[in-house]
Regions:
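N-terminal beta1-alpha1-beta2 submodule of the flavodoxin-like/Rossmannoid cofactor-binding fold
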Residues: 1-114, 180-187
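Residues at the starts of beta-strands that form the adenosine-phosphate
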Residues: 2, 33-35, 130-132, 168-169
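Structural signal for conserved beta-strand scaffold positions within catalytic alpha/beta enzyme cores
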Residues: 36-38, 134, 172-174
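Structured loop/turn residues at beta-strand edges in well-structured enzyme cores
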Residues: 82, 100, 127-130, 168
Length: 187
């Protein structure tokens, strides 16, 4: 199985970075082929510019050549996604949602003519992705995130994005209170 990890955290010493290294080690040990998109190191621009929005509209209407106008990194990421069966996203939760770079990745890459087609008002995945695993860290207690913030990420990303385009196997691993965790637990 080809696994692609999309990682977003600017601090090299972060808990997310330790998770990334553990996931990469586990994949290597099990002999699985994997790749990495490191949004921070790539200098990914999360902003949906006017040319991106125009390409989005045209691609959604059946003009895939509109993708020639989008950010070259988006086209590079498209190629990687087309070879992916298991997508893993790793990022922190800031202000109850994913950081801007990860949100920009979703906005600009999970895009008509890249990730899905629109037919009769329904979205259908174009990608070979069979499973998505989302690993997030936060300092908010899990019950507070669930009860007071309605599991915002589940509605936005799990149901509102991946399941909506037809990827049914989506797992969310939410690690809460990470700053308060003892060092041995973090390792």
């Amino acid at each position: 199985m080809k696994t692609l990890i999309v990682f977003n955290h600017p601090h090299e010493g972060s808990f997310c970075r330790a998770i990334l290294e553990a996931v990469q080690h586990g994949l290597k040990e099990s002999g699985q082929q994997s790749g990495l998109i490191h949004l921070d190191k790539d200098g990914f621009d999360p902003v949906m510019h006017a040319k991106d929005l125009k390409a989005f509209a045209l691609a959604g209407k059946g003009f895939p050549e509109a993708l020639d106008e989008v950010d070259p990194l988006v086209r590079k990421y498209k190629t990687k996604l087309e070879q992916t069966e298991h997508l893993v996203l790793i990022f922190p939760i800031w202000w109850m949602n994913m950081p801007a770079m990860m949100k920009g990745f979703i906005d600009k890459v999970i895009f008509p003519a890249i990730a899905y087609d629109m037919k009769g008002g329904l979205l259908k995945s174009r990608l070979p992705i069979k499973k998505v695993t989302v690993i997030s860290t936060m300092n908010t207690p899990a019950e507070v995130y669930r009860e007071h913030f309605n599991n915002a990420l589940e509605g936005n990303l799990i149901k509102g994005t991946f399941r909506q385009i037809g990827i049914e196997e989506v797992e969310w691993v939410s690690l809460s209170m990470v700053k308060q965790a003892p060092q041995e637990e973090r390792e």
